Amino acid sequence: MTSRRSVKSCPREAPRGTHEELYYGPVSPADPESPRDDFRRGAGPMRARPRGEVRFLHYDEAGYALYRDSSSDDDESRDTARPRRSASVAGSHGPGPARAPPPPGGPVGAGGRSHAPPARTPKMTRGAPKASATPATDPARGRRPAQADSAVLLDAPAPTASGRTKTPAQGLAKKLHFSTAPPSPTAPWTPRVAGFNKRVFCAAVGRLAATHARLAAVQLWDMSRPHTDEDLNELLDLTTIRVTVCEGKNLLQRANELVNPDAAQDVDATAAARGRPAGRAAATARAPARSASRPRRPLE
């Protein structure tokens, strides 16, 4: 420091007119022979200006390629820094089209340093565990379809012996029978047996009532023979159909005979054409039903 000040404090050694205005500033015209006083009065500005100007002249961008190709963060433009930041963000969130870190043997810039800063490599590696942790949630996702399937199975109606299903063909294909769980005719029913027998009774009556109502509708249509919309409206105004099921102990047997509805309609239509009630005509042609008090077959 002392040697530098001694050099700068000797303006008389430098020839006037060459570097005097660069190092020491302009000389006052009032006293051109006293450069030491001018140097003391402007010591602060004159000390800061020559250093900056000398550094600017020394590192000229047009003359030195090393200064332009520097990999310093201060010299990088925003366009160069944005793709690098987006790549690090994409790598931290998960797998994607993010750029992989440069290989150790890749191209390097001037000065032996790579253009990609090494501090961003841990961010890329930090995103790898997140990407590998995402498949861990696949089993949880895989359980959702199974839960949905189980919910569908629970919502579906359970098959019962009553034969009440959505499709008529499946309902008519099942034979109806009361529960055989009670050990004796006088044993009290459990709530499950009572509910089962109720469903069977309603299904049997529904089969017979549907058959009788269909036959009554056919007879009523054949008697009226509507040909226009006005005739149909008049028929609907006068239509009154009452169905009476009088089967008694033969209820289940008669209902099981109606498994094939076409055959049952033909039999009932023939009996109705002869002038006999359909229910009584069918009852005379069949054997008596088994009593409810008789021992039944064991529960399947």
UniProtKB/Swiss-Prot annotation:
Transmembrane segments: none
Post-translational modification: Highly phosphorylated in the host cell. Packaging is selective for underphosphorylated forms.
Gene Ontology CC annotations of this record: host cell Golgi apparatus; host cell nucleus; viral tegument
Superkingdom of origin: Viruses
InterPro entries per record: Herpes_UL49
Biased composition (Basic and acidic residues): 10-22, 50-61
Comp. bias intervals (Low complexity): 269-292
Spans annotated as Disordered: 1-148, 269-300
Family listed: Belongs to the alphaherpesvirinae VP22 tegument protein family.
Quaternary context: Interacts with gE (via C-terminus); this interaction is necessary for the recruitment of VP22 to the Golgi and its packaging into virions. Interacts with gM (via C-terminus). Interacts with VP16; this interaction allows the formation of a tripartite complex composed of VP16, VP22 and UL41/VHS. Interacts with the capsid-binding protein UL16. Interacts with host CGAS.
The name this protein goes by in its record: Tegument protein VP22
Taxonomic classification: Viruses, Duplodnaviria, Heunggongvirae, Peploviricota, Herviviricetes
